[in-house]
């Protein structure tokens, strides 16, 4: 297990929900099996040569040594980080999701992982998209600063790179709490709401930052299922490759067990959940200015949806892009029908692209920083802007 988990981890499949094609890992299956067989033979030879009592004694010493290391590690972590304490976290709810200002609205509509090149391939098959994006300007030279949301979104909101001068979590919290962009909006009288379920913050960190925050506690509603998934995570690293297909699962499912809503309904970033809300919920009107950051799943793995936002078994990256546009068009139409479209600044963008040639798609694991992830989409519409779709 030690050798497998420390020296044979270069080409591990992703745990982000990507549908893994295990046939691409045959060489890893063979290498892993050979190593395990060799180690088993060596252990058997040692058992015969050194005799049972000596092997038993050696294994006992090694086991006690490893146990002491684990106990000391857990002790230090429990003292310094209160790991056994049920902590409260700030999460974002659906509160005021469709509350719009009769004065001015500023909306950032973020579709995760939509690559510009692949987006245009889908666009060309759907002429209705151009009519839906009337009044917008598309910027075809946008580049993402980072390849993943965790780093990319704080950069988008602040223009500030993470330079490792502080712990990343402190940088992230500072950006979400008081980036110059957010501070400017507050000075202009905007009420800020953030609709996202990818982030959680420790209690107190985000107090007063957004209008739709609630506190949730850890709630392991199915301990046996949770423990099974944790064991599977360990198996993905330390088990031989022949067992890894049985250990794979989407780690985002842990999040669904970790948090339980305290009072209000938590926001869900899934395209189908938001699409349902768009169809069923009514827009309400207020006088003050409103800012909304809406972060949806977009074309992020795992792929669930067809272009009509139905859950299907054979969904892929392109159908997920289609579902993203269906949700986007429905939202824009809702704003138009409610009369709050013209008085809204609307930015539709992705935080990064997607490496369509990457892991579990056509070839085995590539460098995670493939340039395909650096080309997002960016559409911008200003107040009372009226013209055909423009490309800049």
Label each PLM-derived region with a short phrase.
Residues 1-35, 43-392:
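Catalytic domains that recognize anionic headgroups
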């Amino acid at each position: 297990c030690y050798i497998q988990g420390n020296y044979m981890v270069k080409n591990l499949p992703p745990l982000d929900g990507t549908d893994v094609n295990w046939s691409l890992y045959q060489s890893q299956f063979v290498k892993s099996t050979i190593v395990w067989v060799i180690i088993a033979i060596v252990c058997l030879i040692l058992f015969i040569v050194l005799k049972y009592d000596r092997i038993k004694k050696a294994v006992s010493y090694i086991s006690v040594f490893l146990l002491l290391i684990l106990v000391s590690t857990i002790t230090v972590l429990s003292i310094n980080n209160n790991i056994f304490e049920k902590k409260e976290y700030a999460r974002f709810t659906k509160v005021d999701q469709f509350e719009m200002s009769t004065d001015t609205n500023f909306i950032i509509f973020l579709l995760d992982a939509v690559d510009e090149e692949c987006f245009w391939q889908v666009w060309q098959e759907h002429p209705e998209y151009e009519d839906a994006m009337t009044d917008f300007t598309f910027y075809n030279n946008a580049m993402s600063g980072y390849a993943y949301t965790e780093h990319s979104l704080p950069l988008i909101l602040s223009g500030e790179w993470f330079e490792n001068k502080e712990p990343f979590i402190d940088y992230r919290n500072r950006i979400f709490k008081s980036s110059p962009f957010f501070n400017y909006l507050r000075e202009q009288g905007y009420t800020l709401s953030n609709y996202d379920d990818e982030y959680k913050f420790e209690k107190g960190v985000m107090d007063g930052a957004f209008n739709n925050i609630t506190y949730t506690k850890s709630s392991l509603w199915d301990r046996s299922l949770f423990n099974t998934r944790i064991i599977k995570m360990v198996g993905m690293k330390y088990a031989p490759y022949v067992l890894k297909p049985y250990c794979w699962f989407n780690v985002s499912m842990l999040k669904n067990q970790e948090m339980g809503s305290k009072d209000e309904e938590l926001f869900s970033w899934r395209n189908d959940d938001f699409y349902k809300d768009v169809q069923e919920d009514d827009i309400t009107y207020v006088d003050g200015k409103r800012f909304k950051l809406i972060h949806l799943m977009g074309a992020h793995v795992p792929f669930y949806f067809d272009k009509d936002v139905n859950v299907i078994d054979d969904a892929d990256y392109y159908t997920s892009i289609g579902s993203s546009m269906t949700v986007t068009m429905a939202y824009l139409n809702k704003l138009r029908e409610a009369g709050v479209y013209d008085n809204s600044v609307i930015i539709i963008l992705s935080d990064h692209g997607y490496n369509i040639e990457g892991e579990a798609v056509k070839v085995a694991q590539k460098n995670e920083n493939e340039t395909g992830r650096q080309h997002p989409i960016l559409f911008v519409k200003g107040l009372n802007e009226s013209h055909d779709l423009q490309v800049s």
